[in-house]
């Protein structure tokens, strides 16, 4: 069984974290040798940057600062966690990666998406996901889920208005057009269990 780099993407409230937890369990049951990680974060240094980028109280952060901080954290994550796992023959399951920067900072902050892409390609070099699962849910549905989930950790980006989240969603649509072979769109209005079953079936195909 080969090792591949898998990422989960989607707007806030898409159920991505819940699906990631279920997928972790099902991949273990399937006997897949893998690690699960996340962004921003995924390594000790990168987790420190995560706290800065997502921290409540940092609302005055300049958009370009946000891009560069996340790209720096991503570089450290790639070097310290992702590449070593792949080199050891382990599949990597990552909650968010560079596509989140293109959607949230590029599209969401009205920045040049091509420039954001180039910054991230500089950071990750050839460590590009083999397969990306996009959990597709309308922005208003996602925000309603966040509001209803009282136990969820609220971060700085959750406090953005509906217009920002719609821009993020439009950004994802552009990214899917840029990398159609890498993306698989999954209807995130389905239950987490249904979504997990769909994704796991495709992962098993990718690994054979």
Swiss-Prot record:
Enzyme superclass (EC): transferase
Keywords associated with the record: ATP-binding, Kinase, Nucleotide biosynthesis, Nucleotide-binding, Transferase
GO biological process: dTDP biosynthetic process; dTTP biosynthetic process; dUDP biosynthetic process
Catalyzed reactions per annotation: dTMP + ATP = dTDP + ADP
Entry GO CC: cytosol
UniProt-listed InterPro entries: P-loop_NTPase, Thymidylate_kin-like_dom, Thymidylate_kin_CS, Thymidylate_kinase
Record carries keyword Transcription: no
Chain sites annotated for binding ATP: 10-17
One Pfam family per UniProt: Thymidylate_kin
Domain of life: Bacteria
GO terms for MF: ATP binding; dTMP kinase activity
Signal peptide coordinates: none
Cysteines joined through disulfide linkages: none
Enzyme Commission code(s) on record: 2.7.4.9
NCBIfam families: DTMP_kinase
Family, as annotated: Belongs to the thymidylate kinase family.
Protein function: Phosphorylation of dTMP to form dTDP in both de novo and salvage pathways of dTTP synthesis.
Protein name per Swiss-Prot or TrEMBL: Thymidylate kinase
Source organism per UniProt: Listeria innocua serovar 6a (strain ATCC BAA-680 / CLIP 11262)
Gene: tmk
């Amino acid at each position: 069984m080969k090792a591949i780099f898998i990422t989960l993407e989607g707007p806030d409230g898409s159920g991505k974290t819940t699906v990631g937890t279920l997928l972790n369990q099902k991949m273990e049951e399937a006997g897949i040798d893998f690690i699960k990680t996340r962004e921003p974060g995924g390594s000790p240094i990168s987790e420190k940057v995560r706290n800065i980028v997502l921290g409540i109280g940092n609302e005055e952060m300049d958009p370009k600062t946000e891009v560069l901080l996340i790209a720096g954290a991503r570089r450290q994550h790639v070097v310290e966690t992702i590449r070593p796992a792949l080199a050891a023959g382990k599949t990597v399951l990552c909650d968010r990666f560079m596509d989140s920067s293109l959607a949230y900072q590029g599209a969401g902050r009205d920045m040049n998406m091509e420039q954001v892409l180039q910054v991230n390609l500089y950071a990750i070099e050839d460590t590009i996901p083999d397969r990306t699962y996009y959990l597709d849910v309308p922005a208003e549905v996602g925000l309603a889920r966040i509001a209803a989930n009282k136990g969820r950790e609220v971060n700085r980006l959750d406090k953005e208005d509906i217009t920002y989240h719609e821009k993020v969603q439009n950004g994802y649509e552009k990214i899917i057009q840029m990398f159609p072979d890498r993306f698989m769109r999954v209807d995130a209005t389905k239950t987490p269990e249904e979504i997990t079953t769909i994704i796991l079936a495709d992962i098993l195909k990718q690994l054979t």
